[in-house]
Amino acid sequence: MRGLQFLLVPAFCLSAFLSAPAQSCSGMSLGREASLNGFIPFPSDNAWNQDISSAPVDPNSSAIINFIGDSTPLHPDFGAGEYAGQTMGIPYDVVSGSPFVTINFTAYGSESDPGPMPIPKNAPIEGYPNPGSGDRHVLVLDRDNCWLYELYSSYPQKNGSWDAASAAVWDLLNDEQRPYTWTSADAAGLSVFAGLARYDEVASGAIQHALRFTLQNSENAFTPPASHWAGNSTDPYAAPMGMRMRLQASYDISSFPPQAQTILAALKKYGMIMADNGSSMFITGDPDNRWNNNDLATLKSVPASAFEVVLIDPLYTPTNVPTGPAPVIGSFTANPSTVSAGEPVTLSWNVSGASYFVVSPQVGAVRGSSVTITPTKSATYTLYGTNAYGRSTATVKVTVQ
């Protein structure tokens, strides 16, 4: 994507064909760490939202936890205020009418979803107000269209575009599997936002999804819902990306303070999914000054030995990654293909086997089989159709006289 012309697309040009169904995201509040007001990303059968409290235990559970370290404490990697000049946690921003801008890829563009994306120039970067050189995640939820946009190693540019090592788009209304062996804005190929412990949920009394966590060591393998590995250990009991752990049902959480108790209840019902290499047993949440840090600190009394590993099945390694056909694009057309500046053009496509679509430039992630644009200059549009086995593309040129 580096070198593409920068585009700012007014929201009114896109709303007619990008708007999400009425039952979706419209109730979200706007802004940083905004409340989703009960909206739960992704369908109820999505891996993040599944009740795994009765799922079978992996036969190697004890050995895996012993490798992690039985006494390794759970650690909330989020909270109120700042530490060393940085906020604690991964921020997110809920936007409406935000201009779509170009994303320039600096590392993993071949495994990323192309722009444009509605990333505000002042979107909070992980670690703000002094994000430094860490992971620098940027998470943006588009309330108008119900898409989630996630960037890794993100740097805003003076012209309004963003540089990022990688990026992924997520349809908040549907299940989406990234292509096997592809990364995302997270090492495991997962959504970062999906696994955050958010203050708005805890304040409501329940977290209704699994949490994201990290371990110091991982094997060169992944298990669903992950799609990517980042192995740094050959130990047979190192965890694969996507491994899920849950707090044992017998573990007494009744004496924990309210915020910690709500988090621990979620870890019993939904568990936590390994998403990246990092400090062991660190769970991720959003930075919010309404967190009670003393309350959250009680989570550190919970040892890894209080958890169990949910059955790892299937397990994918470089020798058995699933293969299959990428989407088949039968046609991608522009009608009309020659217009005067500002006149509408309908881009239409006939595709089989795709999980989601992106049209670039100007449009971004889109549902359905057509989109109407109002180009101001001649451009070649690219359709990207993606599924679990790869991505297919097609192009069409629109001439503006």
What do these predicted ranges mean?
Residues 350-356:
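Short proline/glycine-enriched turn/loop motifs at strand-loop junctions of beta-rich domains
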